[in-house]
Amino acid sequence: MTQPTEPIEFAVSADQITERFSGGSTLPSAVLETLRAICATSVENESLANHGRDWWPLAMHWALQGKTPRKPGAVCAPSTTDQVAALVAVCNTHDLPLTVAGGRSGVCGSAVPLYGGIVLDVTSLQGIVSVDEVSGIVEVLPGTFGPDFENELQSKYSLTVGHFPQSFDISTVGGWVACRGAGQYSTRYGKIEDMVVGLEVVLANGDVVRTGGAPASAIGPDLTSLFVGSEGTLGVITKVWLRAHPVAQFQARASYVFPSFIDGVNACRDSVRNGATPAVLRLYDQTESQRSHGLDGTQCTLLVLDEGDERLVKATLDIVRESAIQNRGTVGDVELVEKWLHHRNDTSGLQALTRKGYIVDTMEVSAPWSKLESIFNGVRTAFMSAPGLSLIHI
């Protein structure tokens, strides 16, 4: 099974790694013994250092200086919901800070245990528990990595959830839910909150609750939505029920070139408003289109991919084509879609640039169609006021 991928090497051996934010992380021996009686618990230098970071760009630079942001006092790896509940109860009793971690693929430092305490590593909670093939609902454990999840779901059940974030190869189902992620196929399948049917969650006092489970409810607040996107602040997710779809039997692709970014935005908007929701509708700005697609630096590229029923896919691509042409688009190189599929999750460039001293960061914003042009221009101008390269896509 897949294990966490560390972002970059440390410049020193494990016993020489220091903390960027110090504060003391040693736990009392009695507490450690209690934790060890519950589940696998590590205080090894390498484990503490790795669980003190994620893919935060600044932390990658600190690693090359022999530093990790902040070490926990221990790393606990429960393999059952009961063990998670017992760990959380111990932290509650002893007033210990608790940070939940999975693949640690985030780029914002949110998996860093800033207050020490323990890191609860959910990656021992792996695998598909059950599949309701009639209803299209899959029960899966939170520490299951994207490739393991989709490979088993597709090969054994001919189903897919359709959630493919850029971090797919190195992130977990629990992380997708806790961080309310969006995948690269979200125009067709929705974001993760559209896929979650129910959750099992351990609360801060160790109690276990189950939310959702029914197709819909007309009574009371939606408790599931409270935990989706809560990033571990309200509880520890220990099981997830997700909607699944039959693996697509037909796929079609297209590419278009626009004289300006706003022309491409308008084409995307018109496509969606006319009922076309292709799995991938990905527009690149002039800089990224030149760098990745070989254009002249003034044009923008739109990549399109859809899958599913052949009739629906063809109709969808027809609507996108009409919208593109009506907004000054011309047909581009469809092979660019295949190139994107092959390289879309590659992180090797990030590590290589970091080793050369560059800061490589990412940010995302959401806005109504009416404000996209002003946001695009504002963000681009702000970034280009400093030396560097800015690449934008929607």
Per-range role (PLM):
Residues 102-105, 166, 283-286:
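Short, ordered loop/turn segments at secondary-structure junctions
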Residues 1-89, 106-136, 286-293, 336-362, ...:
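N-terminal flexible segment immediately upstream of the FAD-binding catalytic core
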Residues 45-61, 246, 252-392:
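C-terminal substrate-recognition/cap domain of FAD-linked oxidoreductases
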Residues 127-282:
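FAD-binding subdomain of flavoenzyme oxidoreductases
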Residues 36, 92, 154-155, 272, ...:
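Anion (oxyanion) recognition and catalysis
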Residues 94, 156-157, 327, 386:
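Helix C-cap/helix->beta junction micro-motif
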